[in-house]
Amino acid sequence: MNPNQKIICISATGMTLSVVSLLVGIANLGLNIGLHYKVGDTPNVNIPNVNGTNSTTTIINNNTQNNFTNITNIIQSKGGERTFLNLTKPLCEVNSWHILSKDNAIRIGEDAHILVTREPYLSCDPQGCRMFALSQGTTLRGRHANGTIHDRSPFRALISWEMGQAPSPYNTRVECIGWSSTSCHDGMSRMSICMSGPNNNASAVVWYGGRPITEIPSWAGNILRTQESECVCHKGVCPVVMTDGPANNRAATKIIYFKEGKIQKIEELAGNAQHIEECSCYGAGGVIKCICRDNWKGANRPVITIDPEMMTHTSKYLCSKVLTDTSRPNDPTNGNCDAPITGGSPDPGVKGFAFLDGENSWLGRTISKDSRSGYEMLKVPNAETDIQSGPISNQVIVNNQNWSGYSGAFIDYWANKECFNPCFYVELIRGRPKESSVLWTSNSIVALCGSKKRLGSWSWHDGAEIIYFE
């Protein structure tokens, strides 16, 4: 090849490479423009909710493989804003209960860093449901687990974690510090309340939106305490039941109405209920009902009915002859709507719940009438109003060969249904005092929700072998 031919060949090659480079550049530019303007075709992105007027959220996606940065501006309109929860829907019809979640915390804790907890519950928000409990500030295998049978210490805190997981130092967040708690979401943000301090001068701190808003001092100097399960909000108003005073005599109970963590109204307990502790509350049809524990006298549970719009309440006892506290006597021939039914030993009571909805009413109780073992759900039509109402069906949740504990109500109020589906949890206590070969007291959780279908029973017990911890 002569010199001229070489020059022509090199020039042609150079021109070809230039054209190819130009085409690649044009394609790259087109790709960038296409990705920029086709926001509607991108995958769903979790965009923070903004409670103000229209705002701009900027998302920067770095794609190192293609060596470009794509900056996308997404305009959020008022249509995407949150609103306060409205409790106008009725309860769903329930014919049985389906499993929702079981964390197996004790079983997993035999070989993992699982926190010692008690007084657990579940609570939902617009994004989903989380598990809550009062941590003891130590793990099952930690040396500080010795002595965690005690309810009140400076080391306890209300923690929450993703539903279905076991609580560990790595997946939990602290909601507030204390040894008694309640928490609920009003549709805009979460309110959490924790009690802490010495028995004779405890106080409550009310958190809203992740910040402390209100403090409440003790009013009777005897273990200021609250629900140990979720509160419920309606149009921004969140009533909470608190008690201060003796556990075995008349105490001072108040219903405190909060909005955005600030007190709107305080009511002294009114009605026939003589002692109130550890209420399990739910809302439907614009009304909030709290089924509580009479630790002084009653084996029948007190019921507080709250009108959150008027900020008023009444109280009475569950009328049914089916007694649901533990310990309790045998079910009598007739119930009592206006006074406690006494009897039962040795335990004065346990936290429990019910869903009271006419023919669609369900009561939960331990299978044993003397100890916190086993758990069953009983369908008892008109249990709230009929002194002769009895069960027409039942479902075993935990068999009587296994320990249960506290139980309580919750509802996913943001589920896409035409009614509010009742749900409940059962605390599965392990360790002391019943199993004294270990130094700790802790629990796992099982949660179930209502089904219109008629499903079978099974025992959802804790399942940990205590011998593995010895």
UniProtKB/Swiss-Prot annotation:
This is Neuraminidase. HAMAP family: INFV_NRAM. Residues 28-470 are virion surface. Intact N-terminus is essential for virion morphogenesis. Possesses two apical sorting signals, one in the ectodomain, which is likely to be a glycan, and the other in the transmembrane domain. The transmembrane domain also plays a role in lipid raft association. One of its GO terms (cellular component) is membrane. N-glycosylated. Binds 1 Ca(2+) ion per subunit. The gene is NA. It comes from Influenza A virus (strain A/Duck/England/1/1956 H11N6).
